[in-house]
Amino acid sequence: MRGSTESLCGTVPTDAAAERLVQSLIDVAGEDQVRTVLLFGSRLVQASPDRFSAYDFVLVVENYRAFYDALVRAGLSRRLPALQAVLNRLLAPNVVAFAPEGWNDVPVAKVMVLEPAALARALSRHAPDHFLKGRLVQRVALLHARDGAAVDWVTGLVTDARNDILRWAGPFLGESFTPAEVALRMLQVSYRGEVRPEAGDRVLDVFESQQPFLSDMLTCVLADAADAGELRLAGGNYQFVRAPSSRQRWSVRLYFARSKLRATARWLKHVVTFENWLDYIAYKVERRMGTRVEITTWERRLPYLLLWPKVVRVLRERPASSRTGAPR
């Protein structure tokens, strides 16, 4: 794919806080454990971040249990390492909080933890769901790689995932389309594949914050597809040489239905894996929706049993889009 390495390694703004967090991860886990660290999300693309926004990392470690043991030894986790490792294998990735300097007005990272094989599977054509693929085909930055082989490895995975966009976004495209239209549709489809406590027009914020990158990246993807004979140019727009079949459409819809179920299961798992998850998500709901959520002592003790009414209320009160093109 044209320009793939630049999309991971080039023109990343210096962020001292992110660098401190990455170095802390390496110090805690050990250089031999940390293969790569990727940054994505609002802190990278500047999609409505504020000083409370966590850094979104994808951390690739060589062994789950060794990593979680290291967090406990450093006093950065109170979770059982054995349980964390089991959950990570059952439904990757785990999402953990990493707050080496505390929680008050200092940098905090929200870390997706994967072993190498799990990341490779999550970004492949045979991914069990869209959770990681939908995020990492967007703009990402490679903050750390153990060596040159690690750079080549992760760059290849992300490049292959981007080259696969037309397979799962294609069934939702019109008869003809531009790179920018594919980029927006890709984000809309990805966001619909999850349960998110945000207004529908959040997808437009994400699109606009990284439109130059997405348009350039999709220009490369579509040009490669045209070279391969999958697309043709017609009046400045692209068209499929052979439109996605009904079978392909149903296969993709089934994939996203399964992905949404697995995403919902991850929300339940986050309560176990993520320190202060309930406070974090309550703040996120307030920041994105303007709805204050108070969590009682008993709801903290029995979240799976007692929090459902508030979850339903938040989803029901989620504001509809007020902007054209952002689906609910």
PLM features: residue spans?
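Catalytic core of pol beta-like nucleotidyltransferases
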Residues: 1-32, 38, 44-51, 63-328
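Short hydrophobic/aromatic beta-strand micro-patches
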Residues: 58-60
